[in-house]
A protein has these predicted regions:
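Acidic, glycine-rich segments characteristic of secretory precursors and extracytoplasmic regions
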Residues: 1-11
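Structured, solvent-exposed acidic/aromatic patches
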Residues: 12-171
Length: 171
């Protein structure tokens, strides 16, 4: 996003650029917290509820889109922050969470992306009319594009692991 790109294109000699160059965030900003906010606050239980309600109603397009967004978001979060609370993230009333290791999150991201593809390849029980195409600002409800997106999430996820010693044995 622009918070990361602006220091690269303007004022290269300033101290804020030095902070960015050393730490990959703009000084005095919350750019590093944006991934947490996206996963836990902006999407959070809204995305969980959308997926659960869509699966219960057999509205596979919405469930697939939800899983694809969830996979992408968690992949991004673990790339930026490493370990994060995943399994206990949305347990009601829990005030302290155990962190999950990055490899567990990477594995779960692939599960969610594959689940997105599986859901998007199913026929919906409901005819949405134009509700999805008018409200999906990313791909306009185009299932084929969402499937490609989910495959891209898997590819990005595995690309992060290619230099691991055990990559060929595990994947």
């Amino acid at each position: 996003d622009l918070r990361a790109l602006c220091p690269l294109t303007q004022m290269m000699g300033t101290s804020s650029y030095t902070t960015f160059a050393n730490n990959y965030y703009t000084a005095a900003s919350d750019a590093g917290g944006e991934a947490w906010r996206m996963v836990y606050w902006n999407q959070g239980m809204n995305l969980e509820n959308m997926i659960n309600q869509s699966e219960a109603a057999e509205n596979w397009t919405l469930a697939g889109i939800g899983y694809a967004i969830k996979a992408y978001s968690w992949d991004f979060l673990t790339k930026v922050n490493g370990e994060a609370p995943m399994k206990q993230a949305f347990v009601p009333g829990l005030l302290s969470h155990e962190y999950d290791y990055q490899d567990a999150i990477y594995d779960q991201v692939r599960v969610w992306a594959k689940k997105a593809i599986e859901c998007l390849e199913k026929e919906d029980k409901t005819n949405y009319g134009t509700r999805i195409s008018q409200n999906d600002y990313i791909y306009g409800g185009d299932k084929a594009k969402w499937i490609k997106f989910a495959y891209a999430v898997i590819a990005r996820n595995l690309a992060s692991l290619t230099n691991k010693n055990d990559f060929k044995q595990k994947y």
